[in-house]
From Swiss-Prot:
GO molecular function: phosphatase binding; polyubiquitin modification-dependent protein binding; RNA binding; ubiquitin protein ligase activity; ubiquitin-protein transferase activity; zinc ion binding
Residue ranges with Basic and acidic residues bias: 10-29, 648-657, 670-693
Transmembrane segments: none
Cellular component annotations (GO), alphabetically ordered: cytoplasm
Pathway: Protein modification; protein ubiquitination
Protein name: E3 ubiquitin-protein ligase DZIP3
Summary of subunit composition and partner proteins: Interacts with DAZ proteins.
Residue spans of biased composition, Polar residues class: 637-647, 1089-1112
Keyword annotations from UniProtKB, A to Z: Coiled coil, Cytoplasm, Metal-binding, RNA-binding, Transferase, Ubl conjugation pathway, Zinc, Zinc-finger
Coiled coil segments of this chain: 14-43, 647-676, 792-853, 904-939
SUPFAM superfamilies: RING/U-box
Organism lineage: Eukaryota, Metazoa, Chordata, Craniata, Vertebrata
Gene3D superfamilies: Zinc/RING finger domain, C3HC4 (zinc finger)
Species this protein is from: Homo sapiens
Enzyme class, first EC level, given as a word: transferase
Amino acid sequence: MDSLPDEFFVRHPAVEDQRKEETENKLEKSSGQLNKQENDIPTDLVPVNLLLEVKKLLNAINTLPKGVVPHIKKFLQEDFSFQTMQREVAANSQNGEEIVPALTLRFLITQLEAALRNIQAGNYTAHQINIGYYLTLLFLYGVALTERGKKEDYTEAENKFLVMKMMIQENEICENFMSLVYFGRGLLRCAQKRYNGGLLEFHKSLQEIGDKNDHWFDIDPTEDEDLPTTFKDLLNNFIKTTESNIMKQTICSYLDCERSCEADILKNTSYKGFFQLMCSKSCCVYFHKICWKKFKNLKYPGENDQSFSGKKCLKEGCTGDMVRMLQCDVPGIVKILFEVVRKDEYITIENLGASYRKLISLKITDTDIRPKISLKFNTKDEMPIFKLDYNYFYHLLHIIIISGTDIVRQIFDEAMPPPLLKKELLIHKNVLESYYNHLWTNHPLGGSWHLLYPPNKELPQSKQFDLCLLLALIKHLNVFPAPKKGWNMEPPSSDISKSADILRLCKYRDILLSEILMNGLTESQFNSIWKKVSDILLRLGMMQEDIDKVKENPIENISLDYHQLSVYLGIPVPEIIQRMLSCYQQGIALQSITGSQRIEIEELQNEEEELSPPLMEYNINVKSHPEIQFAEINKDGTSIPSESSTESLKDLQEVKSKQRKKKKTKNKKNKDSKEDQVPYVVEKEEQLRKEQANPHSVSRLIKDDASDVQEDSAMEDKFYSLDELHILDMIEQGSAGKVTTDYGETEKERLARQRQLYKLHYQCEDFKRQLRTVTFRWQENQMQIKKKDKIIASLNQQVAFGINKVSKLQRQIHAKDNEIKNLKEQLSMKRSQWEMEKHNLESTMKTYVSKLNAETSRALTAEVYFLQCRRDFGLLHLEQTEKECLNQLARVTHMAASNLESLQLKAAVDSWNAIVADVRNKIAFLRTQYNEQINKVKQGFALSTLPPVQLPPPPPSPEILMQQFLGRPLVKESFFRPILTVPQMPAVCPGVVSATGQPRAPLMTGIAWALPAPVGDAVPPSAGLRSDPSIMNWERITDRLKTAFPQQTRKELTDFLRKLKDAYGKSLSELTFDEIVCKISQFIDPKKSQSQGKSVSNVNCVSPSHSPSQPDAAQPPKPAWRPLTSQGPATWEGASNPDEEEEEEEPCVICHENLSPENLSVLPCAHKFHAQCIRPWLMQQGTCPTCRLHVLLPEEFPGHPSRQLPKI
């Protein structure tokens, strides 16, 4: 397991004896000497000794992996308070109490709790503590709580293992400890008798061992080749043991049952209630009710419970047939589902009938010959139905014979392991041979001698020892100190030592197999004996819940333990019943047939005057009457107690051999021997007189010895009814009344003297044997002392070497720790720098991303605004054209109404209707195209990738339409041909097709008709310029003036309009909007009225109702429709006007100064400004000051072709 020598872990007999002698010497030392010894103890030896003590307390520590051992040593060297334990030992020795062992489980748990509290109180982080050390402490604490075995300990241990699992999941470097977590939980489940859960945990632990070459899971080799060498081998051993426990020690036989403990089978849970199936071989299989349903549906679907009658036993390896099935829902109430019964073979008086009379009339025969009546059951017989008193009897039989033997054997095995027992038996062979070296032909194992000294030099197995043999070995081998009053006297109530309790248990065993077996017992007697036996078993180490379980178990389950009872009693239970029946029908004492040699009647008649046996004597007078009368039964009070019937048998044989060699002995006494033995003899004589005065007690002692002999007899696998015991009660009562006394005073005195003589002789022989034994043991102890001295010297050398090596390793560890600490500090500094740089980069990236998102959103909004402005700009001109066409249609309609006979006017009306409809269709088409592109831009499409919007073609000429309506061929020159001028659409992006190289054409404000003189009077040109009075309202004119003159306030413009209205007779209905703008400009700046009129005509082009600019207020507007001779063919893209080209340059509407080519800036909407004027405006507003079109500066989106202005 660790690097220490193997001698530290192998239990050497010499070392064990030395430890016992040192403990005995410590008891004799005073408190001062003890304190001095504590001070003299070298501190270097403390860790080694403590490690050995911890290994003894926790069995799992002996085979832990190498990776855990250094942490255990660290705990024992650094955190274990050895001085506290020494102070407790010193205090106990000063108070006169018995010194406790060097280390107890309670003290180890206390030290582990203190170490864990120190770690938790320090509030360390995962980087500051040793995770492996902390996990090792948790594991040791959980295993120690599991070893202690209290209910609250199981809960706390489960919590500690859960904490281990969570810590390991957080720290992957400690993943090897996960195997220990599942291993500890498996030990916990097995301690709770939840073997299925424990098996699952062991398999999980085995799976956690991944790499077979990982030396972390290795185990240090030992001298014992049977021990595992790796942790994996250890887990495989635990798995095999757990699988065996599932088949043997559990109650529920369903493999998937998680509550298979015996204590759960009758609790008020979902597992309450059980089914019991019994086969012809007396095998009993149990299932929880819920588990039985699952098992039956899985293995035998569709079958009911009664169909299992006669099927093969469910127990593996059993060849019997199921003969009985019980169901238990409430403790004590059993429902029989099916059974196979043959009632004519019950052992009862009613069923025996004539066979019973024949049994009573049989003559005296050899006791080894059984009567001809057959008492054997068929393989499918029903179990017996017991009376109330035998219900109590069998409960006591189970708790004393089975439970008592198990607990005493457990104590005996701890104190005397098989190797040491074999050695002690060889040493004391001469002492034991006189008691046990004789043949017991009816014992299945060959008798006690074959048990103590098996053939082929095998180790003796204590599992085959009965209670009395264990007591005899404890007595002769001095395993425990003798009781206060010795082995031959009943211990007082104040003596609660182990030896006294074992002696009391054997006493109750004798009473049970004698008086209680014959007479039964009442409920009060049962409760009294049960209380005393329970107290004895509790002091010996049995759990209270196990005792209560035996008491609450139904009689049907208790009686099924007769297999084990046959082994512990030494003779099969059916044979005991048969021999008792055979004995009582012949009138022979029960003691003479239960394992002892029968005393021949004739031999006793011929040797009436000879010496009687020192232990017990039967004087039987045979008369003419066929029945046998008992004369008197006397038993020597100085005989060996009834803990072993084998001793009594051997003494009886020795005395009988002496009787055949001698006839009489002289009535002499040795004075020296008498003086030495006077107190002992007087005590025994008083006891003898009491027993002679009470014949009932003599009969009781005989029955005790008879019951002791039954322990080592043969064993069979059948069980018989106890009803025949009532027959024995009847026979015993009939025979007891016929006993008479036949001796006189002279015979009694002679027997008393002879008894004393043999008593003294036996004591002398006993003293000689004791002297030889003590001499031999003293010599052997001297040899062992020399061997121990050599071992101690070698161990001291190894300890010194180990201490030097440990100190060297500690220095190396300290240097490595410092190096690791420096590396951790450097790593921490670099990590902090990396984190700061990462934080700065993340913040920078976040800022740029937010800016990018904002600019992207702004660009998207700008593109949408751009398309909306282009759409509104294009629709503005088309709507204006539609209005002009409507006006022309209205005029032509009015003229046609006044001249109904003119076909030319009717054709003109039809042509203008067609033009209006065509313009309206083009308006709808253009609006649809722009809206589709706006939606695509909103969906994420780039404006540069969209196809350009195609402008609709110009409407047909009215003259062509008129010719079509009149049905005439086209005329080259026509009087009615109008000229339609369409404003230019400036191109600002690839999505709009426009002639960018041509100058901007003025908006068409109206269409004038030039009619010939014969048709009618000419219409004044000014009439075509007047707008409809209904649409000219005050607010609309004010808004348009505000757009044309942004530097003026609304109040100032309103005042100018009022002045103009007063000048024209309180009405502006006769003035057009261009005339109003011209008049207002004169009011604002008379000096610049002419230039302002030009700029107003330029500004008003964005409004649907604006009129074209006029060079002079008095000059009439130019008509849109001209004769063919005066104007060339009109195109939709517009044509340049030579007159307009000759006009002066328009002023800047911001500063009202004239524009020059040097500092001219033209916006996408074709408005012109000074560069120094428009740039600050665009940086603040982002729109054209005239038409409010959204405009972007080049530096906002550098490199984007659609954002480049002609000149800024």
